[in-house]
Amino acid sequence: MTLPSDVREYPNAIAQALSQLRLVGVNGPYSVLLGADAYTALAETSDNGYPVLEHVQRLVKDQIIWAPAIAGAFVLTTRGGDFDLHIGQDVSIGYTSHTDATVRLYLQETFTFLYLTAEAAVALASPAKPKPKKT
């Protein structure tokens, strides 16, 4: 499935994804993860004066999550048992930079996200961007 290019159609696409989950027996509650562009567009768009975000909130009734690391969106169940997060036992600290007043360090840790049930999420790809016209 693909996110529509018109943000006002997001509720229809998300409703179709929810139907797809229900048809394969995946119960809710459900959440929607949106990439940065999709989330910003959803938060800023209204349909005849009513925020499109509120249309989506009525459909999902759980979290709508800003997920800048993804492109497009995912509609997934949060019922439990479908995903697993394994956090590594290694933590490292590193040096980034310094000034005369501060030192910038970072922490790094490994983790693995396991997708246990293939039907527990529906991906909505980003809409195709229009290609520039050749002159």
What are these regions, as identified by a protein language model?
Residues 45-135:
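Sequence/fold signature of self-assembling virion shell proteins
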Residues 1-57:
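Extended, solvent-exposed, turn-rich assembly/linker loops in the middle of proteins
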